[in-house]
Amino acid sequence: PTDDPTHGKQQLALFHGYYEQHQYFPLMISEPTTKHMFLGWLRPGTVHAALGAEDDVLRVVLPLRVEQPDMAIHLRGDCGFGLPKMYQVCEDHQLTYTFGLATNNRLKAQTTDLVTQAAQRYEETGEKQRLFTHFEYQADSWDRPRRVIAKAEHQDAGTNLRFVVTNLPVTSDEQAEQRYDDYVQRGESEQRFDELKNGLELGRLSCHRFLANFWRLLLHVAAYNLLNAFRDAEETPAELRHAQPAKWRSKLFKVAAKIVTSTRRVLLELPTHWPHWPLFEAMCQRVLAFIPYTTPRPAIP
């Protein structure tokens, strides 16, 4: 989830004590390879971080299973999503997962030796230490034991102890480290949220009605995915390839223009000496390449 501050009297924009602001609390699901947003779901400002998450996962997964039944799907999420009902959904639908797990006294007791060993190695070498282990663990709310990976990191600031729960196979401490390092790559999804919020103004959910703002959120997600598709295409000009959304806006869209309409066409008139015209022309040609025409394609004057 990501917090989305509000500054008016929108429906269901409520005060969240942790963030200390009035907000919406949208849930986003992204895919790391294509960097696309698979789902954006607007929620009231005070809901639990995982509210409805298992249903949203199924909204994404079930259509994929119909199209590609044998596709391997792996979910990553922080400890806010690490709930028994989420584990059950993943296991029922043959999904692998790695979720953060909140630290508690039982977990600390099982990793006392690991923490001590990390501290001793740091004292001996003066270098940061990262040690890993794995074990079976069952919380009181779980129906059965599950595999937990523990990381003990020791440096000048002290010991940093973290846990994740996974249903991936783990047969050694080295493999536990690999699984954990893969889990922390979920932080890359935060970059997607930043691009949406800062580059495409996701926070502009300023309609009064909740459903209207929900629609605006979906438009933001669709715009992001469209931009993302062009941004990573080989035919896209090098200056824009992999560029931030803010650069796309400043180079292609922030320009004075005149729109002339007639019964036969809509004409967009741009300044004669616009410095970014070559980029705009190249992207127009790229867009036209997507359009199936039965008649000759229109020329760009």
Region locations from a protein language model:
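A short, flexible helix-boundary coil/loop motif
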Residues: L226-P301
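Gly-rich Lys/Arg/Thr-decorated short loops/hinges at beta-loop-alpha junctions or inter-strand turns
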Residues: T33-G45
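Short amphipathic alpha-helical "interface-anchor" segments enriched in bulky aromatics
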Residues: A176-W215, L219, A223-R231
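An anionic, glycine-rich sequence signature occurring as long contiguous blocks
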Residues: T96-N198, M283-P301
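Short, conserved catalytic/metal-binding motifs centered on acidic residues
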Residues: P1-D3, K35, I73-G82, Y97, ...
